[in-house]
């Protein structure tokens, strides 16, 4: 899944709050086991433990023990409060993307560079939830005259995906409803 690869590129720019939302979104999208959440979000187990604890403390997820063929397994589920949080945060991110798109469409290169710089930490979350139109996003870099890898220069991990042509097919897959709802 290309948006996951994109998150790896931008992972170091993600704020703690963005990681919380991405974990919540992954659980909401059916990734309910610890190891799978860690893989899907590219968040190390130690850090993921803390995030899950925080989400549980805030009442956004519930931890359930299920009996399976191989013994007990822990399953995580999003609560109604957690679902409301996802909807609200996705709405905010859609607003940020809309602003970014409007600046791009205005043709103001300097303003676009400034807004991109200011919103850098939100970009992975926008990508994870399918808010970013990848074609337009790449055209923004063209307008600024820089490559994505230059914009995120210095990111030691995941840069091999920076110019992945496959990313452009992630598109805006019918996300008028916010994607994961």
Annotate the PLM regions.
Residues 1-126, 142-181:
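N-terminal leader-region detector that preferentially activates on the first domain or presequence
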Residues 131-140, 144:
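Membrane-proximal interfacial segments on either side of biological membranes
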């Amino acid at each position: 899944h290309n948006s996951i690869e994109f998150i790896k590129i931008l992972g170091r720019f993600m704020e703690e709050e963005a990681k919380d939302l991405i974990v919540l979104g992954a659980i909401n999208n059916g990734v309910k086991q610890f190891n799978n959440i860690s893989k899907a979000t590219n968040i190390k187990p130690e850090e993921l433990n803390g995030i899950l604890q925080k989400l549980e403390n805030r009442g956004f997820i519930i931890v359930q023990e299920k009996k399976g063929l191989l013994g007990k397994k822990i399953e995580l589920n999003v609560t109604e409060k957690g679902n409301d949080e996802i909807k609200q945060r996705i709405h905010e991110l859609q607003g940020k993307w809309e602003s970014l798109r409007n600046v791009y469409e205005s043709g103001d290169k300097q303003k676009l560079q400034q807004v991109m710089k200011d919103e850098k930490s939100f970009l992975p979350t926008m990508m994870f939830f399918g808010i970013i139109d990848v074609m337009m996003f790449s055209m923004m870099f063209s307008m600024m005259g820089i490559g994505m890898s230059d914009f995120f220069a210095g990111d030691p991990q995941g840069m091999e995906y920076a110019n992945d042509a496959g990313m452009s097919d992630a598109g805006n897959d019918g996300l008028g409803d916010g994607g994961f709802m």
